[in-house]
């Protein structure tokens, strides 16, 4: 027996809804998205707004504290220590269509007869088709977001500023969140940077990272939570650090240590934070060869509390089922997200690159 258009729409929507909320099939093609995972782990939804997501930024103590004698006149001032940083929010969409002819070629019949019930074979065949399409839409959505959110936002009039703008290789120029980084007095709004680091001398790269780490922790004592790197930077640091492995010791209840429990962790670490390789940085280098700062030679020291993904409430990776239009025998499924991305404390982050 065939499917009705409503049955097909319901099956498509429910399948996508289930797929998005559960682990996908084992994937052999798509690359990892550690940057997107970082953003999603600390995302902060917003209620909606006309055009911008606004953050309150404390920029100065505007202090007038001074010594005074027994009957000296003292002063008071009207402190102006808050500014607002405004970041654009926008929308992304990914969708697929299935024509009734395409479905029929796969043994699935669609009819307007409301009394029909699909056969077991049709259910299995439709499930196979939907699984493939839903995996593509979900993975495509993630790949698009991970890639685009590394860029500076100039790639499209609808794009939001990404990491290349928020943690910039030229932090003394440009406007971020409506605050001009080039203006005297706005130094607080600049991230740290060290590019063109020579790796010819052993220990030089590690020393540069030590200095940048210290800069990141200067204001408020907040340490970077994540270090994302391209493959060339990772290889350079691995050689410079001579494959150093951090070791963790677990304290037992009796106060003794037990090296046998989680005695060591694999990977390459700096200050206890693992250097995470971002494949998309290598992909960006392949897509934009000859960039002023090679993408695969970069290292980002980030603070996930201060680098924010702000989806509109209930609008992150939403499965959609647009109705079939009257003059097309085509059925649609989609996924949309509405969000912005901002930064609230650039001076806790740094971008480095090797020569």
Describe every region a protein language model picked out.
Residues 2-355:
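Flexible, glycine/threonine- and acidic-rich loop/arm segments that mediate assembly and lattice contacts
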């Amino acid at each position: 027996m065939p499917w009705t258009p409503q049955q097909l729409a319901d099956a498509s929507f429910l399948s996508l809804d289930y797929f998005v909320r559960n682990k996908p099939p084992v994937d052999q093609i798509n690359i990892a998205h550690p940057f997107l995972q970082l953003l999603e782990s600390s995302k902060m939804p917003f209620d909606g707004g006309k055009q911008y997501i606004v953050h309150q930024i404390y920029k100065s103590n505007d202090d007038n504290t001074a010594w005074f004698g027994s009957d000296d006149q003292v002063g008071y001032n009207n402190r102006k220590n808050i500014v607002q940083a405004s970041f654009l929010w926008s929308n992304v969409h990914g969708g697929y269509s299935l024509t009734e002819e395409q479905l029929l070629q796969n043994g699935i019949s669609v009819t307007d007869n409301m009394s029909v019930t699909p056969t077991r074979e049709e259910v299995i065949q439709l499930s196979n088709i939907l699984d493939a399409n839903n995996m593509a839409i979900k993975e495509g959505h993630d790949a698009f977001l991970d890639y685009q959110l590394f860029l500076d936002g100039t790639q499209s009039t609808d794009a939001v500023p990404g990491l290349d703008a928020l943690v910039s290789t030229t932090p003394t120029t440009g406007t971020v969140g409506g605050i001009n980084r080039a203006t005297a007095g706005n130094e607080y709004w600049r991230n740290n940077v060290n590019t063109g680091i020579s790796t010819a001398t052993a220990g030089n790269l590690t020393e540069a990272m030590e200095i940048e780490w210290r800069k990141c922790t200067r204001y408020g004592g907040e340490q970077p939570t994540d270090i994302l790197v391209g493959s060339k930077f990772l290889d350079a640091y691995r050689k410079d650090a001579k494959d150093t492995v951090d070791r963790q010791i677990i304290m037992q209840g009796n106060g003794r240590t037990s090296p046998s429990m989680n005695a060591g962790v694999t990977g390459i670490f700096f200050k206890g934070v693992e250097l995470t390789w971002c494949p998309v940085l290598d992909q960006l280098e392949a897509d934009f060869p000859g960039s002023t700062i090679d993408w695969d030679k970069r290292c980002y020291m980030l603070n996930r509390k201060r680098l924010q993904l702000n989806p509109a409430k209930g609008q992150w990776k939403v499965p959609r089922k647009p109705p079939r239009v009257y003059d097309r025998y085509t059925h649609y499924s989609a996924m949309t997200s509405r969000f912005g991305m901002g930064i609230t404390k650039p001076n806790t982050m740094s971008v480095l690159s090797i020569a």
